[in-house]
């Protein structure tokens, strides 16, 4: 079983995935790290300081791991595009995402792009199949993990519970060159 933990950068995917790994003993594949380490990309986008993923190579890489593991967690903001059986979409207040990404040293253009993606529900809208959406804003990690475990156990589906558009609409009209 492939479980995708997806969401805009800065929502808490890696933190949540690590706790799930520790509590459930499930193999976690950090998509970003795997793409870099195993050169599963076609090029590096210097402007956005990111890699253009070769999805064919990445899919093959995941398939090989999945042959050995009964269940895997795919941790990454594109994990919902990798044929998961179940998708957890983590959401977070755009202001918190902004702070986290700036702390990580993201360029202003990349910060804005990610804030806009969160406001517009990009990861949620791209997610097809069984989807469970969770707002992580100001929540305890253990509480979030408990909710995820319960959702997976009962194959719960929930989406459309978070809407940042009205409160953060002004971010959608900004542009950084």
Curated annotation (Swiss-Prot):
Pfam families, per the entry: AAA_18
Catalysed reaction equations from the record: AMP + ATP = 2 ADP; ATP + H2O = ADP + phosphate + H(+)
NMP, as annotated region: 30-53
EC number annotated for this UniProt entry: 2.7.4.3
GO-annotated molecular function: adenylate kinase activity; ATP binding; ATP hydrolysis activity
UniProt keyword list: ATP-binding, Kinase, Nucleotide-binding, Ribosome biogenesis, rRNA processing, Transferase
Annotated region described as LID, given as residue ranges: 103-113
InterPro entries for this protein: Adenyl_kinase_AK6, P-loop_NTPase
Keyword Calcium: no
Enzyme class: transferase
Record-linked Gene3D superfamilies: P-loop containing nucleotide triphosphate hydrolases
Subunit-level organization: Interacts with uS11. Not a structural component of 40S pre-ribosomes, but transiently interacts with them by binding to uS11.
HAMAP family recorded: Adenylate_kinase_AK6
Its biological purpose: Broad-specificity nucleoside monophosphate (NMP) kinase that catalyzes the reversible transfer of the terminal phosphate group between nucleoside triphosphates and monophosphates. Also has ATPase activity. Involved in the late maturation steps of the 30S ribosomal particles, specifically 16S rRNA maturation. While NMP activity is not required for ribosome maturation, ATPase activity is. Associates transiently with small ribosomal subunit protein uS11. ATP hydrolysis breaks the interaction with uS11.
Full protein name: Putative adenylate kinase
Organism: Methanocaldococcus jannaschii (strain ATCC 43067 / DSM 2661 / JAL-1 / JCM 10045 / NBRC 100440)
């Amino acid at each position: 079983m492939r479980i995708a933990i997806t969401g805009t950068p800065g929502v808490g995917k890696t933190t949540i995935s690590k706790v799930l790994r520790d509590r459930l003993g499930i193999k976690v594949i950090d998509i970003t790290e795997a793409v870099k380490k195993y050169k599963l990309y076609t090029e590096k986008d210097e402007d956005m300081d990111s890699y253009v993923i070769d999805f064919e190579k990445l899919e093959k890489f995941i398939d090989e791991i999945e042959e050995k593991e009964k269940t895997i967690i795919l941790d990454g903001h594109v994990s919902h595009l990798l044929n998961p059986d179940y998708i957890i979409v983590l959401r977070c207040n755009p202001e918190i995402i902004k702070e986290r990404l700036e702390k990580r040293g993201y360029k202003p253009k990349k910060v804005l792009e990610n804030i806009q993606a969160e406001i517009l529900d990009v990861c949620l809208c791209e997610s097809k199949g069984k989807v469970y959406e969770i707002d992580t804003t100001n929540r305890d990690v253990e509480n979030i993990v408990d909710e995820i475990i319960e959702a997976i156990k009962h194959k719960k589906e929930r989406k459309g519970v978070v809407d940042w558009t009205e409160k953060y609409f002004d971010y959608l009209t900004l542009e950084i060159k």
